[in-house]
């Protein structure tokens, strides 16, 4: 029993055929180019995707509740700026509890961190907190731009930190474009983008 959110990352003109009907996603050239439209599919859905090219994220979560299939156009996706100063970042709330009533188990957002800024600050966790209504595992999927330079490496990178209260996990890792990092427990943050 898994629900699904389909998010174009660097793909356009996507046809999605499901047991709930046909859907068309406009998509975008890349994650830094624009906010994108997206599609939610409930438990028990089947789908096939056809696109001209590029990447599409298929995000899933185990769920007991059923919500109807739902297409959301890009102009209806809420975008906010969180934090301030060097901890400011743009958050695109795709399928979050505040933006989508079906987000009971699945929670999908994009965070764009300007060069030199910190995200996931202050560090936070979604497990073992008294009174917290959610226990979330997270998957961070990193897309990082390139900076052409005569003397430097054009491949972008960032830093990501996770740790647990008991110290069983305490890692700071270098992340590059296309890396994924699983956070099943504990604090995560900061994520640091190098200066532009």
Predicted regions and their residues:
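Glycine- and acidic-residue-biased ligand/ion/polar-headgroup-sensing regions
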Residues: 2-23, 54, 115-116, 127-180, ...
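A cross-kingdom feature marking solvent-exposed beta-strand/loop segments within repeated
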Residues: 22-36, 167
């Amino acid at each position: 029993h898994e629900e699904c959110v389909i998010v174009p990352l660097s793909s356009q003109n996507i046809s999605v055929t499901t047991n709930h009907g046909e859907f068309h996603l406009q998509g975008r050239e890349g994650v830094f180019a624009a906010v994108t439209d997206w599609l939610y599919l409930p438990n028990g859905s089947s789908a096939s995707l056809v696109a001209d090219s590029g990447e599409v994220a298929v995000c899933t979560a185990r769920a007991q509740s059923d919500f109807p299939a739902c297409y959301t156009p890009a102009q209806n996706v809420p975008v906010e700026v969180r934090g301030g100063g060097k901890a400011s970042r743009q958050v695109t709330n795709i399928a979050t509890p505040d933006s989508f009533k079906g987000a009971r188990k699945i929670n999908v957002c994009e965070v764009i961190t300007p060069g030199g800024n910190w995200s996931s600050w202050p560090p936070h966790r979604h497990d073992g907190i008294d009174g917290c209504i959610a226990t979330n595992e997270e998957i961070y999927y990193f897309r990082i731009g390139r900076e052409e330079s005569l003397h430097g490496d054009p491949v972008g990178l960032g830093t990501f930190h996770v740790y647990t209260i008991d110290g069983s996990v305490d890692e700071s890792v270098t992340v590059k474009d296309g890396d994924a990092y699983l956070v099943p427990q504990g604090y995560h943050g900061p994520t640091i983008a190098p200066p532009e």
